């Protein structure tokens, strides 16, 4: 998708001096064709236009182990890609009553899949790249499980929306101990 590459190039140009890094989300089920960018070929094109800033690439939980392994190998060997974010919303985990709706499923039911993907990634990246975990982290216990699985950082979203800022403070405090 050449249009996406041009969009990222424009984003880098306009924000490079304003930010410390970028998360390139090529995993959203809400944007038609975006998940097609989850390829080594696209990562190589991204490297070619990447600024001298931290760049993490966000992947979907629905990738096969083989596909994720190829992407992680590319990230591990890259001098321009800082790491990855695992995982975004899922189309496969959708509840039956929501199957016909657009978008993806996030929250609690995503946790086990995300935890598994984080474990795979930690083994592949061997601490050489930054691994950010997200997906179903709705408690301190789950945040700690992500860290034990190999995540360097833990991101939350759905739990923050429903539990508020206090949740973030509680999790951050537990992870700091």
How should these model regions be labeled?
Residues 1-9, 35-37, 56-77:
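Active-site glycine- and acidic-residue-rich loops that bind
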Residues 1-23, 28:
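Active-site beta->alpha loop and helix N-cap motifs at the rims of alpha/beta catalytic domains
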Residues 12-18, 47-51, 74-79:
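Acidic (Asp/Glu)-rich catalytic clusters
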Residues 21-23, 54-58, 81-85, 130-132, ...:
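Structural preference for beta-strand elements that scaffold enzyme active sites
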Residues 26-38, 68-127, 167:
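Glycine/Thr-rich beta-alpha phosphate-binding loop at enzyme active sites
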Residues 26-28, 83-90, 141-170:
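Glycine-rich phosphate-binding active-site loops on the catalytic face of alpha/beta enzymes
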Residues 51-63, 121-133:
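Short beta-strand/loop segments at the ligand-binding rim of alpha/beta enzyme cores
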Residues 63-78, 122-127, 137-154:
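Catalytic cores of alpha/beta
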């Amino acid at each position: 998708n050449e249009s996406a590459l041009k969009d990222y190039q424009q984003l880098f140009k306009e924000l490079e001096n304003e930010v410390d890094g970028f998360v390139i989300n090529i995993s959203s089920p809400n944007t038609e064709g975006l998940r097609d960018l989850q390829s080594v070929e696209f990562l190589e094109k991204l490297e070619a236009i990447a600024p001298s800033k931290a760049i993490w690439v966000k992947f979907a939980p629905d990738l096969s182990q083989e596909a994720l392994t190829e992407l992680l190998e590319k990230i591990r060997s890259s001098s321009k890609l800082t790491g990855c974010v695992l995982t975004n919303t899922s189309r496969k985990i959708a509840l039956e009553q929501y199957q016909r709706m657009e978008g993806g499923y996030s929250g609690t039911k995503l946790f086990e899949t995300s935890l598994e993907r984080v474990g795979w990634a930690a083994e592949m990246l061997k601490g050489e790249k930054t691994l950010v975990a997200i997906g179903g982290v709705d408690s301190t216990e789950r945040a700690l499980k992500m860290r034990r699985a190999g995540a360097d950082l833990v991101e939350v979203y759905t739990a923050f929306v429903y539990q508020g800022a206090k949740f973030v403070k509680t999790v951050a405090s537990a992870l700091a101990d």
